[in-house]
């Protein structure tokens, strides 16, 4: 990891990125890929900004990005995800529930990014839950399927601790989400108007 989340400051993160390129780590991986010894180079990080920086310095095939493109967080649409499309970089997306609240809803002590969700996040999720309820759709299904609307996202890791949770994740992913739900979320300003939707991606295939 070379991100701020892992190292606690932008300065240390920047130093780790420089180390990757200055001390030959990236060069060695690039040579292995060129020789056919490995097929791809990627990084697992918690922030899209460092992914964008890495793409400015080298040729990466993909990133495992945790929790930075969700129903609650879409800043990656500004520049990073369009860059991924342009560079043919695939995203494996972890943390589609922002560590809990998009799965549990706005329950007492709901978790948002590993901490107690602040009031403004709780209110936003309540509004999302109301839209989902009006379409007889669980919030968790909307949260899991939303992220797959972007063509840079190749797969999603919702997390599971048992076979039962794996089966539950499959059921959530297979839940039918009406197109009108996405339209209502957009209409109420709960997701960005430029956020691509699962129905749009399916129609483009």
Question: What is each stretch, according to the model?
Answer:
Residues 1-204:
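Beta/alpha (TIM)-barrel catalytic core signal, keyed to glycine-rich beta->alpha loops juxtaposed to Asp/Glu
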């Amino acid at each position: 990891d070379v991100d701020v989340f892992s190292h606690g400051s932008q300065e240390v993160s920047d130093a780790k990125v420089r180390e990757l390129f200055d001390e030959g780590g990236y060069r060695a991986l690039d040579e292995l890929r060129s020789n056919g010894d490995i097929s791809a180079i990627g990084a697992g990080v918690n922030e899209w900004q460092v992914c964008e920086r890495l793409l400015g310095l080298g040729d990466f095939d993909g990133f495992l990005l945790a929790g930075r493109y969700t129903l609650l967080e879409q800043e990656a649409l500004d520049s990073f995800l369009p860059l991924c499309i342009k560079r043919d970089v695939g995203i494996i997306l972890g943390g589609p529930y922002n560590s809990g609240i998009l799965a549990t809803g706005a329950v007492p002590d709901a978790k948002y990014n590993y901490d107690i969700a602040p009031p403004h996040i709780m209110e936003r999720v309540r509004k999302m839950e109301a839209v989902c309820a009006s379409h007889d759709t669980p919030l968790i299904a909307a949260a899991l399927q939303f992220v797959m609307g972007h063509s840079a996202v190749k797969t999603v890791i919702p997390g599971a601790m048992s076979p039962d949770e794996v089966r539950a994740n499959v059921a959530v992913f297979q839940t039918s989400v009406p197109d009108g739900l996405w339209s209502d979320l957009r209409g109420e300003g709960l997701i960005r108007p430029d956020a691509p939707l699962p129905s749009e991606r399916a129609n483009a295939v």
